[in-house]
């Protein structure tokens, strides 16, 4: 029996989380445990909660929410407080929205997969891209189809995940009948907004909202972003080695 721990950054009630769990339970000889944040934690990246205690709240058998925790908290505490033996796989998702290019650095979904990798466990992040679609309109049927294709191959070693790397999977905003297949691609480059929108409440107090600007991407390169826009699922191996190795020698020369 293979043990899979799943979490997300949309919260324990999110439809994508429950669709993921249902899809995984259709894979033979798999046991699924859910540990998810008690509320939405989008864009919390790979943060841990170090300034207050955390507690598990049992929802059902093998289903817990972690009170006011981040996705990385969920993975860390589940591994050290719930499991006596490490699970075979950590899966984060299915996120309500894509995690493409530099989104990965902000993503709580990807942060949870990073934590799994740091704990020595194979990890995958699944995210559903939306263009002009709503969650209700597009649903998760294609995403679940992709989960059931990829996960057994990871568990069986057909898809190799080296140490300190996780697999980032983004699902295109198309119906299953229009799905074009799978493409392995590098993470692209997002073009982020360079302005902030000022608002005022009825009393005239100023405030700002983050994340409400449309994002573009650098064209002319094959990337996870272009692949998704073409109707393919993107598969991107993400490594945790953040050293810019190509710059090491030049930097050393500056200090000789």
Curated annotation (Swiss-Prot):
Q: Which reaction does it catalyse?
A: a ribonucleoside 5'-phosphate + H2O = a ribonucleoside + phosphate
Question: So which cofactors does this thing need?
Answer: a divalent metal cation
Its main subcellular localisation, reduced to a broad class, is cytoplasm
Q: Which residues bind a divalent metal cation?
A: 9-10, 42, 95
Q: Which GO terms describe its molecular function?
A: 3'-nucleotidase activity; 5'-nucleotidase activity; exopolyphosphatase activity; metal ion binding; nucleotide binding
Give the signal peptide, or none.
Answer: none
Q: Which GO terms describe its cellular component?
A: cytoplasm
InterPro entries listed in its UniProt record: SurE (IPR030048), SurE-like_Pase/nucleotidase (IPR002828), SurE-like_sf (IPR036523)
Localization, per the record, is: Cytoplasm
Q: Which domain of life is it from?
A: Bacteria
State the function annotated in the UniProt record: Nucleotidase that shows phosphatase activity on nucleoside 5'-monophosphates.
Q: Which NCBIfam families match?
A: PRK00346.1-4, PRK00346.2-4, surE
What family does the Swiss-Prot or TrEMBL record give for this protein? Answer: Belongs to the SurE nucleotidase family.
Q: Which HAMAP family match?
A: SurE
| Protein name as it appears in the record | 5'-nucleotidase SurE
- List the taxonomic lineage: Bacteria, Pseudomonadati, Campylobacterota, Epsilonproteobacteria, Campylobacterales
Q: Which gene encodes it?
A: surE
């Amino acid at each position: 029996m293979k043990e899979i721990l799943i979490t997300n950054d949309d919260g324990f009630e999110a439809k994508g989380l429950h669709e993921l769990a249902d899809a995984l339970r259709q894979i033979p000889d798999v046991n699924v445990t859910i540990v998810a944040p008690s509320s939405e934690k989008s864009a919390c990246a790979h943060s841990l909660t170090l300034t207050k205690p955390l507690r598990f709240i049992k929802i059902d058998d093998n289903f817990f929410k972690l009170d006011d925790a981040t996705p990385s908290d969920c993975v860390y505490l589940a591994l050290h407080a719930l499991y006596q033996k490490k699970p075979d796989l950590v899966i984060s998702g299915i996120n309500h929205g894509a995690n493409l290019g530099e989104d990965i650095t902000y993503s709580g979904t990807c942060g949870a997969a990073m934590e799994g990798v740091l704990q020595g466990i194979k990890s995958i992040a699944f995210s559903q891209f939306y263009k002009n679609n709503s969650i209700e309109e597009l649903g998760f049927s294609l995403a679940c189809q992709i989960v059931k294709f990829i996960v057994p191959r990871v568990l069986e070693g057909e898809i190799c995940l080296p140490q300190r790397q996780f697999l980032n999977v983004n699902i295109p905003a198309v119906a299953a009948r229009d799905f074009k297949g799978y493409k392995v691609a590098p993470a692209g480059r997002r073009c982020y907004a360079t302005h902030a929108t000022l608002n005022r409440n009825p009393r005239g107090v100023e405030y700002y909202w983050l994340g409400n600007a449309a994002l573009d991407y650098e064209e002319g390169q094959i990337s996870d972003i272009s692949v998704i826009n073409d109707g393919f699922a993107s598969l991107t191996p993400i490594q945790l080695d953040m050293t810019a190795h190509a710059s090491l020698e030049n930097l050393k020369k500056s200090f000789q």
